[in-house]
């Protein structure tokens, strides 16, 4: 039984869809993003997607937000620290990291799963994970209780 499953079951029992909100962490600044995430949860967001900024996102709608977050110096370690603080404030709200593969690869796959778990992240969306790399990334995440979607 995961936070994601409990969240979806609660929404199903309430006969409503889940309000899943995406935030590019670091836009306009890491501190402002963290405050925004807290306000979104307090206002009723059921689940938060923590968007990791990337210099060349495939989803062009988030390109400008990613550029601003990168200009603000946002890094994956900082995002994980923010996730950890959000987790302490909101222990039942699912947090899903939304990232591109290059960011994860540069961070280091060997430490990724354990660091996601330590930060209280509930899932990983790796939107551009190549099929040939899934055999390495998926077991790392699953071994740490982090479901991954590609």
Regions found by a protein language model. Give the residues of each.
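Hydrophobic alpha-helical segments and helix pairs
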Residues: 90-125
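N-terminal small/glycine-rich loop or linker at the start of catalytic domains
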Residues: 5-27, 61-66, 86-98
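Conserved, mostly hydrophobic/aromatic
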Residues: 21, 40, 48-51, 116
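Glycine-rich loop at the start of a catalytic domain that most often binds anionic cofactors/ligands
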Residues: 32-40, 60-66
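Short, well-ordered coil/turn segments that N-cap beta-strands
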Residues: 14-19, 44-46, 90-95, 121-123, ...
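Active-site mouth loops of central-metabolism enzymes
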Residues: 19-35, 70, 94-108, 149
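Generic structural signal for hydrophobic
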Residues: 40, 86, 115-116, 141
């Amino acid at each position: 039984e995961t936070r994601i499953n409990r969240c979806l079951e609660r929404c199903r029992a309430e006969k409503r869809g889940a309000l899943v909100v995406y935030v590019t962490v670091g836009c306009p600044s890491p501190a402002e993003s963290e405050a925004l995430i807290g306000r979104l949860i307090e206002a009723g967001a059921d689940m938060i997607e923590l968007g990791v900024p990337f210099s060349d996102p495939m989803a062009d709608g988030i390109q400008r937000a990613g550029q601003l977050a990168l200009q603000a110096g946002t890094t994956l370690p900082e995002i994980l620290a923010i996730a950890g603080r959000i987790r302490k404030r909101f222990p039942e709200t699912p947090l899903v990291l939304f990232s591109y593969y290059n960011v994860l690869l540069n961070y280091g796959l060997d430490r990724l799963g354990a660091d996601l778990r330590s930060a209280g992240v509930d899932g990983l969306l790796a939107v551009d994970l190549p099929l040939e790399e899934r055999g390495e990334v998926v077991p790392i995440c699953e071994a740490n209780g982090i479901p991954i979607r590609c």
